[in-house]
Curated annotation (Swiss-Prot):
Coiled coil: none annotated. GO terms for cellular component: chloroplast thylakoid membrane; photosystem I. It is found in: Plastid, Chloroplast thylakoid membrane. The gene is ycf4. HAMAP family: Ycf4 (MF_00437). It is a multi-pass membrane protein. Belongs to the Ycf4 family. It comes from Pinus thunbergii (Japanese black pine). Keywords: Chloroplast, Membrane, Photosynthesis, Plastid, Thylakoid, Transmembrane, Transmembrane helix. This is Photosystem I assembly protein Ycf4. Seems to be required for the assembly of the photosystem I complex. Its main location: plastid. GO terms for biological process: photosynthesis.
Amino acid sequence: MNRRSKWLWIEPITGSRKRSNFFWACILFLGSLGFFLVGISSYFGENLIPLLSSQQILFVPQGIVMCFYGIAGLFISSYLWCTILFNVGSGYNKFDKKKGIVCLFRWGFPGINRRIFPRFLMKDIQMIKMEIQEGISPRRVLYMEIKGRQDIPLTRTGDNVNLREIEQKAAESARFLRVSIEGF
């Protein structure tokens, strides 16, 4: 939901709380928990989970490896759940014509840099860039080129946005900021 007036435009950015992230975090957690429990079951010689038989798995080569993969998967799963819990990457883009300032706000992991809040002057914005790569894994990213700085992404690099939407968003941004558009 964009909030837009003649002088102010606030565009919310979704973070890591997406259905796909919930899906993969659940799958990874359940799979790695299964691996870990089968490895532990092979050590004790009993089935801790009735559905997962560990009778033919020897502990020394296979059980240890399954425990290791299970623990590694649980660590990766906990990282995914932390990104979902803290909603890393969410925030907003705020364009204020009255003050002549562009503010980009994003949430990060807890700590000193939890709030990422760079500010730029509108007069320093040179153009809006679109990076479009087609192929097996298409990449469509919108950048803001600022004088004396690196290009700042306005869209997430992992978002699967179709070409029409990214072009429309680039046109809206360029029209509001009164800058040109470049595609590469």
